[in-house]
Every structure is written in C-alpha cells, then in structure tokens.
A protein has these predicted regions:
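Helix-to-loop junction immediately C-terminal to a conserved catalytic motif
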Residues: 27
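Conserved ABC ATPase "signature" region
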Residues: 42-43, 90-108
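ABC ATPase NBD coupling module
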Residues: 44-60, 90, 204-207
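Conserved ABC ATPase signature
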Residues: 113-117, 121
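Conserved catalytic motifs of ABC-family nucleotide-binding domains
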Residues: 134
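Catalytic Walker B motif of ABC-type/P-loop ATPase nucleotide-binding domains
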Residues: 138-141
Length: 245
C-alpha cells in the first residue's frame, strides 16, 4: 500500500477488516508483526520515542466523532497543538487559529464551546485542529459518520481542498462510498487484513470483483451473506424437526 504525496487515498472495507488498525500502524500506536510501515522514508516502528514524537508532529488526525476537548472553546481546541508543539507568540497563534477556522468556515464561531456546535460544525473544528500545524500527512477515521447531507458534502469538499492547499497526503478510512469516490485519487479495498482490490474511483465503480461490487452498490446479499452462518440450512433444520415430530 502506497500513499503518494499530494494525493487523497481511501481505505474501504467492512467493519473489523483492518482499516483503523492501518491508521494506528502509521501513527506508531501499533507495531507490525511482519513487514514495515514507512512515513517520509522513516520506518515507524524503528523510531525511538523522540523520533516518533517528531514524526507525529507532521501528522494530523481527524477522529471519528471529532474528539474535541469539551472544556475548551473552539479557539482553544485549534490553538492546543500550536501551544504544545511550538514557541510561537500568542499574537501569531491567534492569527493562525483564525486562519484555520476561516478555512473551514467557522471563524465566527471561535468563542463557542463544543456543546454549542452541531455535529457537522464539530467535525469542521476538528478538521481545523488536524491541520493546525500544516501536516504532511492527514488521517481521517470515518469523517462522514453521522453527518447530514449538507455537512457531509462540506466535509468532503474540505478534505480535498485542504489537502491540495497544503500539498499533503490524506488517508480516508470510510464506509461512505459515494461521497468518498467524489474526492479521492485512489482506493484500497481491504478484507480480513488483506488488500483485495485497488484502483481509481472509476476503476472501483466498474469493478467486477464480487465483494467490491456488493460494497460499492450496497447490495444486501453477495460474498457478504445476508444470513449469519449456521451448522444446518433452514430447510434441513425444519425437516429434522418434522421427522422428530
């Protein structure tokens, strides 16, 4: 799996297939049992704590439900990384925070608390925080989950726009196929920890791979069966009961 600089790449697949685990491997939260993960030429699991800390400063992360600090204002949420990881004066931090919030359309909401935000607004604040330090790599864990159609479209457009503006690389872990295919350059489909298909958005839409076709078009039955596996078929079970009766 390769994530080229300047590209937006989606990782798709059923729950539990290894999508979020991939993000955790990239971020150094987990170590691979075999193989290696390289970010900017560095093998992540070989870095010491200081090296990993420096590498993580160059990464941004948007968690599934934003994960904003609930006791901090919108402004302080976005300023948090700047205060923790830089020696910038507060006047410059203020300018940068308002710039990031302006980029996601929420400069006017800088004094609000997370509890005063809608789900879509909270996700946009979290996105502003994720790009606060102009990262080279931005990771998104289910960025579209639980959003209304308008907010979903806004987040998708922001992911694409901010990636292009920063010249960064973005990894989008998602189940939202149709929205993702509008913004990504490449897609990896994962099943049981393995890549089973990959290609451009157009390749994926027209894939003949049964699993990919079922996932993309939301078909109720296919390789992923509607029925949970049982020892006996329903017909055999009924016949067995009838024979006993």
């Amino acid at each position: 799996m390769e994530i080229p600089r300047g590209k937006v790449v989606a990782i798709m697949g059923l729950s539990g297939c290894g999508k979020t685990t991939t993000l955790r491997l990239i971020g150094g939260q987990l170590q691979p049992t075999k193989g290696e993960v390289r970010v900017a030429g560095q093998v992540v699991h070989e870095l010491d704590s200081d090296g990993l800390y420096k590498l993580r400063r160059r990464m941004g992360m948007l968690f599934q439900f934003g994960a904003l600090f609930t006791d901090m204002s919108v402004y302080d949420n976005v300023a948090f990384q700047m205060r923790e990881h830089t020696d910038l004066p507060e006047s410059m931090i203020r300018d940068l925070v308002l710039l990031k919030l302006h980029a996601v359309g929420l400069r006017g909401a800088h004094n609000l608390m997370p509890g005063e935000l809608s789900g879509g607004m909270a996700r946009r604040v979290a996105l502003a925080r994720a790009v606060a330090l102009d990262p080279m790599l931005i990771m998104y864990d289910e960025p579209f989950a639980g959003l209304d159609p308008i907010s979903l479209s806004i987040i998708g457009e922001l992911i694409r726009t901010l990636n292009d503006a920063l010249g960064a690389s973005s990894i989008v872990v998602t189940h939202d196929v149709q929205e993702s295919l509008k913004i990504v350059d490449y897609v990896y489909f994962v099943s049981e920890g393995r890549i089973i298909a990959q290609g451009t958005a157009d390749d994926i839409k027209h894939s003949k791979e049964p699993y990919v076709h079922q996932f993309v078009w939301g078909e109720a039955d296919g390789p992923v069966s509607f029925h949970y596996p049982t020892a006996k078929s329903y017909k055999d079970e009924i016949l067995t009961r009838s024979a006993r009766a």
